[in-house]
């Protein structure tokens, strides 16, 4: 699939933007109920998780502090999986934990890759310093 090699940075950037945007929506939903979720009466762990979803997702989306934000998002989803989903079954398909597992692994990949130099605040600030 050599034809994808020339657009690899753009594909990675598009993935980063979309995944960050989708993740931030979970935080918005927790805090404000904007997508049908229940806002209010959150315990401390849900407040922390919602804050990481909202802020971390937004940072990943815009490409600012991408590696740190993606790592925090990955850890948050790993905690969500093991605290809330794992007790309902061994496999993600059994315990409705597929989304948490996929988010955790995609964010870990993005933490390893970083903003990747295109379509990010990090890349625009790096080029302005040169």
Description of each model-found segment:
Residues 1-32, 46-51, 55, 62-130:
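Extended, low-polarity transmembrane helix blocks
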Residues 35:
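Short, flexible helix/strand-to-coil boundary loops that buttress conserved ligand/catalytic motifs
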């Amino acid at each position: 699939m050599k034809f994808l090699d020339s657009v690899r940075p753009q594909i990675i950037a598009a993935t980063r933007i979309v995944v960050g945007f989708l993740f931030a929506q979970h935080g918005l939903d927790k805090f404000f109920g904007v997508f049908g979720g229940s806002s209010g009466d959150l315990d401390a762990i849900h407040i922390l998780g919602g804050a990481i979803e909202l802020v971390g997702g937004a940072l990943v989306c815009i490409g600012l502090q991408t590696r740190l934000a993606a790592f925090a998002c990955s850890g948050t989803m790993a905690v969500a999986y093991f605290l809330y989903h794992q007790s309902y079954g061994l496999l993600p398909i059994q315990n409705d934990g597929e989304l948490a597992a996929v988010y955790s692994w995609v964010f870990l990949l993005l933490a390893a890759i970083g903003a990747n130099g295109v379509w990010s605040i990090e890349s625009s600030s790096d080029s302005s310093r040169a």
